């Protein structure tokens, strides 16, 4: 569905994708750091995508988009997890049937908001980005997941002219404006049992705190 007027626009889309033998990430990595994948017999992805824009006046505009989704594996079995005794002696490989679980690295909610202020040659853009919880394996366990995060970035730009140029734009990007502590990725380096106690050696990729980048663009 799509609607557009001079000051407002709206789009929506619904999707459903059913997979046979979908190749998905397992949350593990190889000895050289590559993300490992495997085929899943029965899975699906479905969701709703929304996008909108509002021009409040000649100076102020808002753009936003939102994706709501379900990303599921049916009849999932976690296979071949090593089991050791308390003396580090290997006992067996254990498999556990978990039923319907979430596909790894597939958040259910992703949203973006851009508020743009423009005055003559000056522009300021506030970008908000939200990602809901996502799992670093296919077991839907919160202990092996990336926490939801909401991050804001601010971009400032001023365009002017210099001799022998079409335009010059000086910009300033303030990333992670509110200094949020968050991670965007992770993996299980090793998962095993000691008796009945599960051990997950998890690794995460923390992102930078508030940082500022200056840039200059010259068009001839």
Spans of model-derived segments:
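Membrane-embedded beta-barrel scaffold of Gram-negative outer-membrane proteins
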Residues: 1-39, 44-46
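Residues on the lipid-exposed face of transmembrane beta-strands in outer-membrane beta-barrel proteins
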Residues: 1-3, 48-54, 64, 113-117, ...
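Residues that define the transmembrane beta-barrel architecture of outer-membrane proteins
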Residues: 4-6, 42-46, 107-111, 148-152, ...
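Repeated loop/turn-to-beta-strand initiation elements of outer-membrane beta-barrel proteins
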Residues: 7-10, 58-62, 121-125, 162-168
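Gram-negative outer-membrane beta-barrel transporters
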Residues: 15-19, 38-138
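Extracellular/periplasmic, surface-exposed regions of secreted and cell-surface proteins
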Residues: 23-25, 37, 50, 79, ...
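Flexible, surface-exposed loop regions and adjacent strand-edge segments
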Residues: 26-36, 69, 75-90, 131-132, ...
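C-terminal beta-signal and adjacent terminal beta-strands/loops
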Residues: 130-136, 158-220
